[in-house]
């Protein structure tokens, strides 16, 4: 084949005509120091606060400090291979995480990458980690119940959809148990759950995931884990990633529940970050904006107005206290941000009252409006009765000759305390809770020995399930007890009492 010169020149001319000058311009900087997950970078003069940076080896970073001559950034990943003198690139994007239905049933790290070995997450939807919370106009007051399945919670410190209810207590008092039971209780409902584990042992997180899987709760749950072995920046950002995933469902008009386990460890991680970034320390060496750290997170949980879709995001933050000191810096901060708290006490826990809820110190500021009418009817005096019982029990220790009324009150109180105990991983439906509290309030348990109450309760539920199913379903549908229904419940309880005592 003969090569013709004019053909070659024509091809060259064509290529020159079609040549497009594509140059990728990116602003770069040089690492001047790195350690403990914090990098100081020189040369990124156009960087934005919260912007993602690209470190060598594909590791991401997030801009936290903007100073005159350098930028302080948190490395979101393994930083041991990053050295001084390495080049860092700006991405022009604010920190974001994947969101959507594809995350349900998965365990991800603080930046949304899967860590459960089930392959990549297929989603094209990303959302910014730091978003401003909805304004006043976009919100609506809490009016729907978020059933926890725990008698003590649903009766005395009810939680509503869109509420922020703090779970506070010393270590090993059952804080995570309350949260996990609440997730398990959402089975068969319309609530998507997000469990954010911050600074916990990996074995503990694996245990929680296994329990959720055993009860079929992973079908509607996302787990975000920033374990104790991960760097402070990842522990700091994990709750924001979790709430961003929850907001996706809230903004679609769905209902979501998020658990932060626990925010004390996030505050410690943020303190570490701030001190490494040379920010001035304040009380307990926390930085001045540690209140804003938690308030901007918890304000993102709310009930949206009907015009905005009517979705909700309910938050159950957990705070660990030291030796029951609720007046420390972080506990008081979070108590003042949330709409109430469930206070778990170690003395109650060790005396066998589980969940170990201290009724006197626990409160729900907005949940009462969301409580079902039937529960309000039976649990209205419960808190007062228990408080009076505790007072009487304290006095009864001094003397033995008590009048009949006091003895009856003590006996009733003892039985109320007993029926509010509940085994872990066994949440109850609203109508069954109403029945057992109704039985206690109306004297059906007064003559029974306290030791038989657990068996009484289990057999009573079985009796209503098998022989009074229509009454149970009516109570479930009506959500209130009228005179006719009350008569039927009393008759059924009388019948069961005869059979139980026989």
Curated annotation (Swiss-Prot):
Any one GO CC term of the record: plasma membrane
GO molecular function, one term: ATP binding
Catalysis performed (reactions): ATP + H2O + 4 H(+)(in) = ADP + phosphate + 5 H(+)(out)
EC numbers for this chain: 7.1.2.2
Residue positions binding ATP: 169-176
Site positions for Required for activity: 362
Predominant location category: membrane
Gene3D superfamilies the UniProt entry points to: 2.40.30.20, ATP synthase alpha/beta chain, C-terminal domain, P-loop containing nucleotide triphosphate hydrolases
Compartment annotation: Cell inner membrane
Enzyme class: translocase
Keywords linked to the UniProt accession: ATP synthesis, ATP-binding, Cell inner membrane, Cell membrane, CF(1), Hydrogen ion transport, Ion transport, Membrane, Nucleotide-binding, Translocase, Transport
Membrane topology: Peripheral membrane protein
Subunit structure: F-type ATPases have 2 components, CF(1) - the catalytic core - and CF(0) - the membrane proton channel. CF(1) has five subunits: alpha(3), beta(3), gamma(1), delta(1), epsilon(1). CF(0) has three main subunits: a(1), b(2) and c(9-12). The alpha and beta chains form an alternating ring which encloses part of the gamma chain. CF(1) is attached to CF(0) by a central stalk formed by the gamma and epsilon chains, while a peripheral stalk is formed by the delta and b chains.
Sequence similarity: Belongs to the ATPase alpha/beta chains family.
Function: Produces ATP from ADP in the presence of a proton gradient across the membrane. The alpha chain is a regulatory subunit.
Protein name as catalogued: ATP synthase subunit alpha
Native organism taxonomy: Bacteria, Pseudomonadati, Thermodesulfobacteriota, Desulfuromonadia, Desulfuromonadales
């Amino acid at each position: 084949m003969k090569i013709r010169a004019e053909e070659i020149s024509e091809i060259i001319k064509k290529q020159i005509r079609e040549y497009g000058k594509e140059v990728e311009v990116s602003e770069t900087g040089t690492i001047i120091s790195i350690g403990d997950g914090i990098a100081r970078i020189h040369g990124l003069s156009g960087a934005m606060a919260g912007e993602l940076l690209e470190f060598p080896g594909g590791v991401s970073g997030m801009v936290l400090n903007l100073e005159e001559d350098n930028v302080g950034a948190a490395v979101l990943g393994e930083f041991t291979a990053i050295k001084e003198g390495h080049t860092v690139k700006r991405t022009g994007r604010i920190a974001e995480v994947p969101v959507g239905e594809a995350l349900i049933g998965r365990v991800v790290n603080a930046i949304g990458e899967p860590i459960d070995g089930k392959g990549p997450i297929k989603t094209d939807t990303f959302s910014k980690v730091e978003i401003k919370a909805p304004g006043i106009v976009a919100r609506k007051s809490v009016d729907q119940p978020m059933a926890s399945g725990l008698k003590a919670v649903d009766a005395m410190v009810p939680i509503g959809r869109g509420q922020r209810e703090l779970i506070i207590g010393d270590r090993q008092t059952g804080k995570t148990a309350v949260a996990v039971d609440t997730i398990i209780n959402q089975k068969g409902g319309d609530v998507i759950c997000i469990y954010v584990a911050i600074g916990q042992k990996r074995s503990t997180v694996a245990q929680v995931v296994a329990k959720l899987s055993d009860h079929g709760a992973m079908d509607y749950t996302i787990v975000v884990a920033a374990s104790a072995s991960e760097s402070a920046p990842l522990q700091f950002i994990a709750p924001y990633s979790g709430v961003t995933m929850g907001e996706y469902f809230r903004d679609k008009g769905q209902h979501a529940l998020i658990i932060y386990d626990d925010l004390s460890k996030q505050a410690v991680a943020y303190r570490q970050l701030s001190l490494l970034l040379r920010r001035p320390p304040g009380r307990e060496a926390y930085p001045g904006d540690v209140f804003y750290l938690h308030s901007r997170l918890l304000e993102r949980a709310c009930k949206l107005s009907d015009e905005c879709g009517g979705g909700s995001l309910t938050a159950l933050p957990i705070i660990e206290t030291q030796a029951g000191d609720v007046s420390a810096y972080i506990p008081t901060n979070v108590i003042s941000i949330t709409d109430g708290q469930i206070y778990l006490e170690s003395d109650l826990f060790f005396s066998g009252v589980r969940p170990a809820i201290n009724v006197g110190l626990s409160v729900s500021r907005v949940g009462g409006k969301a409580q079902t009418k039937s529960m309000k009817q039976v649990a209205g005096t419960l808190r007062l009765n228990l408080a009076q019982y505790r007072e009487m029990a304290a006095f009864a220790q001094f003397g033995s000759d008590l009048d009949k009324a006091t003895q009856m009150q003590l006996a009733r109180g003892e039985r109320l305390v007993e029926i509010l105990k509940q085994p872990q991983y066994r949440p109850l439906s609203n109508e069954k809770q109403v029945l057992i509290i109704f039985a206690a309030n109306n004297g059906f348990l007064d003559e029974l020995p306290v030791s038989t109450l657990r068996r009484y309760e289990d057999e009573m539920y079985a009796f209503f399930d098998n022989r009074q199913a229509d009454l149970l379903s009516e109570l479930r549908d009506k959500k209130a007890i009228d005179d006719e229904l009350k008569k039927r419940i009393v008759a059924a309880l009388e019948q069961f009492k005869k059979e139980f005592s026989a």
